Amino acid sequence: MSLSTEAKAKIVAEFGRDANDTGSSEVQIALLTAEINHLQGHFSEHKKDHHSRRGLLRKVSSRRNLLDYLKRKDVARYTALIERLGLRR
């Protein structure tokens, strides 16, 4: 199950430059992080759900690529974002 519309709107409002900013790297990374955290809870209960695990790994890879892009373009925004999201790095 993906995030609700309200949860997505809250993340966009928190990490976006304005209410309609859904394309910036920070917003995309924050949305992927929320979806990854949701799926991790799913796997604590459904350990053998390998089909969904593939989707999780795809989201993790996508987030990794966006983080690498942001780090290349603007290190200050990158470090601020990983601190706000609580990601290791």
UniProtKB/Swiss-Prot annotation:
One Pfam family here: Ribosomal_S15
CDD domains: Ribosomal_S15p_S13e
Gene Ontology biological process terms in this record: translation
Gene3D superfamilies named among the record's database cross-references: 6.10.250.3130, S15/NS1, RNA-binding (1.10.287.10)
Entry's Gene Ontology cellular component terms: cytosolic small ribosomal subunit
Key words of the record: Ribonucleoprotein, Ribosomal protein, RNA-binding, rRNA-binding
GO molecular function, one term: structural constituent of ribosome
Description of how the protein assembles with itself and partners: Part of the 30S ribosomal subunit. Forms a bridge to the 50S subunit in the 70S ribosome, contacting the 23S rRNA.
HAMAP family in the cross-refs: Ribosomal_uS15_B
Entry function: One of the primary rRNA binding proteins, it binds directly to 16S rRNA where it helps nucleate assembly of the platform of the 30S subunit by binding and bridging several RNA helices of the 16S rRNA.
Family affiliation: Belongs to the universal ribosomal protein uS15 family.
This protein's name: Small ribosomal subunit protein uS15
Gene from which the chain derives: rpsO
